[in-house]
């Protein structure tokens, strides 16, 4: 008798729930509670003495790379950064503990959002074993205590579907717009300037930036440029000028990120070329070597 294995790597997902997406009370409740989960202060000025903004960016980039490599749910990374910012807003932390804190925050966020969460052992491997699983588990309890076990934070991803369904967008472009908006949200999470922005504003600005960047026609000719911004602001009850500034800031961060990536690529290519030249010009005669 032959056995047939039908198991696959595909994670089963629930279908979009109309009871949640078509009821404006859900959006209203999200807008009501979202600010409860924001950092209470700009902690680099008044709490942290050892940690600098560039260090946060470095650990955030590392966390994003881990989440991408492990194919985590889109919500895991922004939620982990929310935990990290809220912790740093209340507890002075040494810079040698920052990566450990980042790993703990990913550990907690994946437990909340993933079907199969990240393991402590796997996260320790991503730190080149600079931390031990037991250390991570001990810090998990510390972080939970300082966050008062309030882990179900509202993130920009919670607003995406509510915003998209209220816009007259072509159905064949929805997936592309959603992916671009999710990329912008992840980008915002790596930048401390967005840490104290309401998630609804980041979500709305990301959707606006995605639509403008893709140069899509939004159904009605009247719904473009400033009118699109006004329509988006109305959906999430956001101030139009604040939303416009947020969207411009998102686009600016994107340009900066792309420029940085391009420079790094050029540097890698140039160093590779230099290595090849060095290799080609290596003297083959021992008498040519100047000791």
Swiss-Prot record:
MF GO annotations: cyclin-dependent protein serine/threonine kinase regulator activity
Signal peptide stretch: none
Localisation: Nucleus; Cytoplasm; Nucleus membrane
Membership in a protein family: Belongs to the cyclin family. Cyclin D subfamily.
Pfam hit, one: Cyclin_N
Biased composition (Polar residues): 279-291
Quaternary structure, from the entry: Interacts with the cdk4 and cdk6 protein kinases to form a serine/threonine kinase holoenzyme complex. The cyclin subunit imparts substrate specificity to the complex.
Keyword terms of this UniProt record: Cell cycle, Cell division, Cyclin, Cytoplasm, Membrane, Nucleus, Phosphoprotein, Ubl conjugation
One of the record's GO cellular component terms: cyclin-dependent protein kinase holoenzyme complex
Disulphide bridges: none
Protein name from the UniProt record: G1/S-specific cyclin-D2
GO BP: any one term: positive regulation of G1/S transition of mitotic cell cycle
Region described as Disordered: 261-291
The keyword Cytoplasm appears for this protein: yes
